[in-house]
Amino acid sequence: MHHHYIGDKAFYRRVFGVAVPIIIQNGITNFVSLLDNIMVGQVGTVPMSGVSIVNGLLFVFNLCVFGASSGAGIFTAQFYGSKDDEGIRHTFRFKFLICIVISLVGAAIFLLGGSSLIGLYLTGEGDAATAAGALDHGLKYLAIMLWGFLPFALTNTYSSTLRETGETFIPMLGGIAAVFVNLVLNYILIFGKFGAPEMGVEGAAIATVISRYVELAIVAGWTHSHKARNAFIVGAYRSMYIPGKLLRSITIKGMPLLVNEFLWSSGMAVLSQCYSTCGLDVVPAMNICSTLFNLGSVVYLSMGNSVGIIMGQMLGAGHSEEDVRDTNRKLIAVSIASGVMFGGLMAAVSEAFPGIYNTTDAVRHLAAQLIWISAVMMPFGSYLNATYFTLRSGGQTFVTFLFDSCFMWVFCVPLAFCLSRFTNLPILPLYAICQATDFIKCVIGTVMLKQGKWIQNLTV
């Protein structure tokens, strides 16, 4: 039993070799967004509400970019496993083209419908002046953030390809540089330090956009200046040719991932909108809770990425089913352990953390209780995340689409919608009930893992 779930030193060296750079990058990114959030929180509850609503909407765009490049990424990891540089070059081109298209479509949607989208979250009980102020701050923030769409999408194209070809340090370095640039500029521009004007939420947006360009310069610059290491980049832009057969394969395997990320993230946005109908205090309280949760979930989410990469490489290299299952079981055990540990830490700081924000006692108290509920659910989230990446690594993208998005829209969203519209249920039981739907997904995920249909080599 002991060796069933616990690996040897070589196993952990391999896992942490892949996971630690991703954890460091995501950890620093989330830690800095926590500091950003606290800085914006010092400006007041109303600007914080506006910014948090916009960030919730931008999350949908970010995950669409991630989903679009992930579909091709399944093939990149397996091409790397079979040492096929030409294959990697084609997947890189696919990512490049689709990420540009998503950036342009996303910018058009937010330019035309930004005001209506933000307004959906400001319908809860509370005074009209608060809602109008939050809308105004949100629109100013959004207008500047749109300038960061293209560099974000291109950075994702380069960074994901480097990670899938075994280079995790440079994306980490680019990410770290970007978050420090963001942090320093935030401090200067939000509060008007060193002779700069005091710009509040607009300063936060300018800092983020500049940091996106810095990250792109580092990651793309390194890729192009190390052509011997990154053979795929040689001639990558000479044409945009992608073989029809591969294009079909990526589209068939990858489209469910893109649609999945869009539906899942937009489902999360709808859930937030349902919660917001319980009162205007819910928006800032949820923002405080999700900021801490995002930092706490870094390790298990990064472990999920590692599960996908390690499983993809093993499947591409043709390992036996027994080996693949054994490694997968141990990876999931590490993931659950991280969820238990960080869930415990979140619960421990649930009372103290909301005290950092310049907001009302009612918002702080509500945030502390929401943090507790999130902390209890974290181990289950970590199991689901590892399961999702396992199924995806073998190309089971349609199954993961059913598992993730269909469940969200068929079950979670209607449940939250009905409870928020047709009952007087307060926010805490409403949030707890919606979170508890993860228990059902855990059962479904376990059945899918045991079936083993995900164990397949896509490169042959």
PLM features per residue range, with description:
Residues 48-108, 152-171, 283-350, 381-403:
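Small-residue-rich hydrophobic transmembrane alpha-helices
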Residues 6-38, 42-43, 59-71, 75, ...:
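N-terminal transmembrane alpha-helices
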Residues 17-36, 144, 178, 211-215, ...:
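Transmembrane helical elements of multi-pass membrane transporters/channels
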Residues 1-19, 76-148, 196-255, 311-377, ...:
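Short alpha-helical transmembrane segments in multi-pass integral membrane proteins
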Residues 45-56, 138, 142, 205, ...:
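Small-residue hotspots at the loop-to-helix junctions and early N-terminal turns
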Residues 27, 31-49, 118-132, 188-199, ...:
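Helix-terminus/linker motif at the lipid-water interface of multi-pass membrane proteins
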Residues 24, 36-40, 51, 76-81, ...:
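Hydrophobic/aromatic residues within transmembrane alpha-helices of membrane transport systems
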Residues 69, 145-163, 171-179, 204-220, ...:
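Short runs within selected transmembrane alpha-helices of multi-pass transporters and secretion channels
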